[in-house]
C-alpha cells in the first residue's frame, strides 16, 4: 500500500506500508539510502510484515517517487523533521506500538539523528550497512565547486559518486536493476550535498545521545562503507544494549544478496527479542 503523507511544510511524501494480518507486535520505520527508494526494499517490507510488524518506508523528499524538488534538501533539520513528524503521525494512528527505526546505508545517518532527537518515539535503532563512515566520496575539487554553488545556486546539481552498480552488489540481477532504475537518484543539489556534510558533523557528536537498543548489520565485502571505522563509531554509543551482525561475503545492499531473507529474519528476530 502506498499513500501520500504531507509534511508540516506542505511537501507531499510517498509512504509505502505493509500491515500484518494480526495485531502488530512492533512498528518498523525503514529509512532508505541517498540513491535508493522504497522500490528497492519491497521484499524487506513484506518479510517484516509477515513476521508480525507494521512496516513503513517513506521516499525521502526529492527522491524516489517524490518528484518535487528532485535531489534537493533545504537543510539537515528538515530531513530529520520529516522523520519525527512521520513517527508522530504513525503513533497517533496506532498508539502504544514500540517503533524500531531502521536506517539503511546513507539513511543510517538520518536514523541516528532521529533516535537522538526523538528518543520518546524511537524504542530501538537498527543500522543496516550504515553510511556514517564511507569509503567513497567526492574529490576536493568537487567539494569546492559544491561549496561555491551552495552560496550562488543551491539547486545546481552534481553527480552522486555511486554510479557503478557493482559498489552496491555483486549480483548481476541486482546490478541490472540499479542500472536501469528510473527512480534512482543519480544527481543531488548543492543544498542536499552540503546538508549531508552537516549531517555528518551532527552524527559524529550523537553517540552519547543514543541510549536505545541498537543493532548494527555489516556486509563483509562492503565497498561503500568502512566497516572498521563503523565498528569504532558503534562502540562509542551510549547504549548498553548493542548487537553486531556481520555477513561475510555480502556486499553493501543486503537486499540484493542471493538470500535476502537472511538479514530480514535476523532483523525481525532482534526486534522480537527486545520485547521478550
Predicted ranges, named:
Residues 35-37, 64-94:
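Catalytic nucleophile-loop/oxyanion-hole region of alpha/beta-hydrolase
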Residues 45-68:
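Conserved alpha/beta-hydrolase
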Residues 104-189:
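Alpha/beta-hydrolase-fold enzymes
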Residues 212, 226-235:
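Short alpha-helix in the alpha/beta-hydrolase fold that links the catalytic acid
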Residues 221-225, 253:
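Acidic catalytic loop of the alpha/beta-hydrolase fold
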Residues 210, 216-218, 222:
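Short beta-strand/loop motif that positions the catalytic acidic residue
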Residues 243-276:
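Catalytic active-site module of serine/aspartate enzymes centered on a nucleophile-bearing elbow/loop
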Residues 1-20:
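N-terminal cap/lid segment of alpha/beta-hydrolase-fold proteins
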Amino acid at each position: 500500500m502506498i499513500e501520500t503523507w504531507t509534511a508540516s511544510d506542505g511537501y507531499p511524501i510517498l509512504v509505502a506500508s505493509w500491515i500484518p494480518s494480526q495485531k502488530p507486535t512492533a512498528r518498523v520505520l525503514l529509512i532508505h539510502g541517498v540513491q535508493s527508494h522504497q522500490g528497492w526494499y519491497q521484499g524487506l517490507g513484506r518479510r517484516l510484515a509477515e513476521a508480525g510488524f507494521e512496516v513503513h518506508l517513506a521516499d525521502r523528499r526529492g527522491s524516489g517517487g517524490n518528484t518535487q524538488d528532485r535531489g534537493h534538501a533545504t537543510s539537515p533539520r528538515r530531513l530529520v523533521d520529516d522523520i519525527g513528524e512521520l513517527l508522530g503521525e504513525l503513533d497517533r494512528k496506532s498508539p502504544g506500538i514500540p517503533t524500531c527505526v531502521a536506517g539503511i546505508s546513507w539513511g543510517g545517518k538520518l536514523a541516528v539523528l532521529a533516535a537522538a532527537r526523538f528518543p520518546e518515539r524511537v524504542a530501538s535503532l537498527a543500522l543496516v550497512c550504515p553510511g556514517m563512515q564511507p569509503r567513497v566520496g567526492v574529490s576536493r575539487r568537487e567539494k569546492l565547486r559544491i561549496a561555491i554553488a551552495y552560496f550562488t545556486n543551491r539547486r545546481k546539481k552534481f553527480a552522486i559518486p555511486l554510479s557503478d552498480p557493482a559498489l552496491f552488489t555483486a549480483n548481476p540481477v541486482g546490478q541490472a536493476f540499479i542500472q536501469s532504475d528510473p527512480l534512482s537518484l543519480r544527481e543531488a543539489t548543492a543544498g542536499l550535498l552540503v546538508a549531508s556534510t552537516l549531517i555528518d558533523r551532527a552524527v559524529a557528536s550523537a553517540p552519547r545521545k543514543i541510549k536505545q537498543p541498537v543493532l548494527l548489520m555489516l556486509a563483509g565485502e562492503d565497498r561503500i562503507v568502512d566497516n572498521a571505522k563503523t565498528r569504532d563509531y558503534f562502540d562509542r554509543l551510549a547504549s548498553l544494549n548493542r548487537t553486531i551482525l556481520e555477513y561475510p561475503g555480502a556486499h553493501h545492499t543486503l537486499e540484493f544478496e542471493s538470500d535476502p531473507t537472511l538479514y530480514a529474519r535476523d532483523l525481525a528476530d532482534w526486534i522480537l527479542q527486545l520485547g521478550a
